[in-house]
């Protein structure tokens, strides 16, 4: 019997425990903010200890522990890193009014789906990494090289205490390739992602009585006009690298299938979202202050200097406005035809009868941090059903499929 058949048989025999672990993981609430993931990290530790797996806590911030562990094969070879995060989006105290059909930290199973905050983003994917680490330890005499598990905190806020800290301070986590289980849909594999630029704009005017509009400009109207000008960024030309353009054209249907109709259209474009806006004190006053936050997504191939120059030219037209840069994560990508991409495609074909398509992610993941170090990083995860909203859930079949795909692909990578 081949090792890959043995891996699948082991997963089939242990699937009840694999599902139960994800339920327990979801029940260990780890919203960020505030970001305390200690209870959830203990759930992971308990499972790893039960299977006698090597691991350690790396906690540069006491309430945001990271879990790192490595196993070696029978001889030197390639080094694969598994990466997932422990923290999840927060939930409102009034969750029942938001339409949740079950408490968000319940991990309850309804119609063969596991419900709860973090079920798709990304406790399903992180669980797949953990089980892959456990499973491959049983076959370490049959593979070469090294397998490293990284379960991190502080991802949801792009914070400094998770993957960013590990990559800067723990050489063990770098490796030759990274595999991540962030939600991507079974139909797509992410080899890159758009970057992000977060800006805060503040507008100040003299203000006045609401009937005396001749005495002062309205800060809210100035902000509105500025936002309209910023929309022009979406029309900027982007020179997508040729090999990526080919991959994007081939994957358009699968991209829309996994991420919603229109996803393929905006992937190669700059997009603007005004996430928050605040201004004015009273209906019959001309506002003297208004502020808003802009979320600009940057496609692979965009010229950052061109983006910043365009923003500067726009802002110059509005002397009442000032701007502050809050965050910049450049876009990232690796080879859309790389070794791990081919391995993932082949295993999904064998398991599900179709080949997922390579795509660039619309949102941000920690996989970018490995790409910034010129280490290929690929993302294959569940469909993002309810991600960040009510009734987040993952079908049990999709979860088990992910465990199988990651375990088989890790084995293939380390035996190639």
What does each of the following model-derived ranges do?
Residues 10, 21-24, 28, 43, ...:
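Generic non-transmembrane alpha-helical segments
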Residues 85-87, 209, 388:
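Histidine-centered divalent metal-coordination motifs
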Residues 114, 119-234, 241, 266-270, ...:
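Fold-level recognition of mixed alpha/beta catalytic cores in primary-metabolism enzymes, strongest
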Residues 192, 265, 282-287, 334:
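Short, solvent-exposed beta-strand/turn "edge" segments of beta-rich domains on protein surfaces
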Residues 210-276, 285, 300-321:
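Acidic-enriched catalytic cores of C-N bond-cleaving enzymes acting on peptides and small amides
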Residues 2-115, 138-143:
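Acidic/His- and Gly-rich active-site-bordering loop/insert found
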């Amino acid at each position: 019997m081949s090792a890959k058949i043995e891996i699948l048989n082991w997963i089939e025999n242990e699937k009840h425990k694999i599902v139960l672990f994800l339920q327990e993981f979801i029940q260990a609430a780890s919203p960020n903010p505030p970001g305390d993931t200690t209870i959830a990290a203990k759930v992971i530790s308990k499972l790893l200890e039960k299977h006698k797996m090597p691991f350690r806590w790396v906690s540069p911030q006491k309430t945001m522990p990271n879990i790192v562990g490595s196993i070696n094969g029978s001889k030197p070879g390639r080094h694969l890193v598994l990466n997932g995060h422990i923290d999840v989006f927060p939930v409102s105290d009034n969750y029942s009014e938001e339409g949740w059909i079950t408490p968000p930290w319940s991990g309850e199973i309804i119609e063969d789906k596991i419900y709860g905050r973090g079920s798709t983003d990304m406790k399903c994917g992180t669980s797949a990494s953990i089980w892959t680490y456990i499973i491959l330890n049983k076959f370490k005499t049959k593979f070469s090289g090294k397998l490293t598990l990284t379960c991190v905190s502080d991802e949801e806020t792009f914070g400094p205490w998770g993957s960013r800290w590990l990559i800067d301070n723990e050489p063990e986590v770098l490796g030759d390739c990274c595999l991540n289980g962030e939600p991507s849909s079974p139909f797509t594999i992410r080899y890159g992602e758009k970057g992000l630029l977060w800006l805060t704009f503040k507008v100040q005017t003299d203000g006045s009585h609401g009937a005396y509009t001749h005495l002062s400009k309205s800060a809210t109207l100035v902000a509105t006009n500025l936002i309209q000008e910023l929309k022009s960024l979406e029309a900027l030309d982007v020179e997508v690298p040729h090999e990526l353009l080919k991959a994007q054209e081939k994957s358009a249907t699968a991209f829309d299938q996994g991420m919603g109709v229109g996803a393929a259209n905006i992937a190669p474009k700059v997009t603007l979202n005004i996430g928050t806006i605040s201004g004015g004190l009273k209906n019959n006053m001309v506002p003297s202050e208004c502020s808003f936050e802009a979320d600009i997504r940057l496609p692979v191939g965009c010229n950052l200097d061109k983006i910043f120059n365009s923003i500067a030219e726009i802002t110059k037209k509005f002397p009442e406005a000032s701007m502050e840069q809050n965050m910049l994560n450049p876009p990232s990508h690796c080879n859309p035809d790389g070794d791990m991409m081919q391995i993932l495609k082949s295993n999904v074909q064998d398991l599900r009868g179709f080949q997922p398509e390579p795509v660039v992610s619309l949102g941000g993941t920690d996989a970018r941090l490995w790409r910034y170090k010129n280490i290929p990083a690929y993302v294959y995860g569940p469909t993002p059903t309810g991600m960040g909203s009510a009734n987040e859930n993952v079908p049990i079949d999709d979860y088990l499929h992910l465990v199988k795909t990651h375990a088989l692909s890790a084995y293939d990578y380390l035996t190639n």
